[in-house]
Amino acid sequence: MIEVALGAGLGASVRYLITQVLKSKTRVFPWATFIINITGALLLGFLHSKITSSHILLLLGTGFLGGYTTFSTFQVELVTLVNNRKQKMMIIYLLLTVICGILAAYCGSWLGKL
């Protein structure tokens, strides 16, 4: 349990820093959340193919990547785009995130098997 808590705190802190850096550079498309969720999918795919230790998976997978990635922010950003009458951008964001997330997880899994 301590592995999850430590990893989650660190993952959330890294996510916050990345969001702050990218926040001022983006306007409409939520790049920070997109990049965070896609890199998280890639890393989780890699970990699940490469790591066999349950403690390391708890620390890095469930903990760090659980704190690093953010499904709830993704949902709120979709709703915000709709509320701001940016339906096309919402659809693009939704599709890109789902498709790229699946591809990233697959690539991470493939890389982990090398």
Curated annotation (Swiss-Prot):
Activity modulation: Na(+) is not transported, but it plays an essential structural role and its presence is essential for fluoride channel function.
Q: Which GO terms describe its cellular component?
A: plasma membrane
What membrane topology is annotated for this entry? Multi-pass membrane protein
Q: Which reaction does it catalyse?
A: fluoride(in) = fluoride(out)
TM ranges are: 28-48, 56-76, 91-111
The record's keywords, sorted A to Z, are:
Cell membrane, Ion channel, Ion transport, Membrane, Metal-binding, Sodium, Transmembrane, Transmembrane helix, Transport
Q: Does the keyword Ion transport apply?
A: yes
This entry's Gene Ontology molecular function terms read: fluoride channel activity; metal ion binding
Please give the function described in this protein's UniProt entry: Fluoride-specific ion channel. Important for reducing fluoride concentration in the cell, thus reducing its toxicity.
Record HAMAP family: FluC
Q: What is this protein called?
A: Fluoride-specific ion channel FluC 1
Q: Please name the taxonomic classification of the source.
A: Bacteria, Bacillati, Bacillota, Bacilli, Lactobacillales
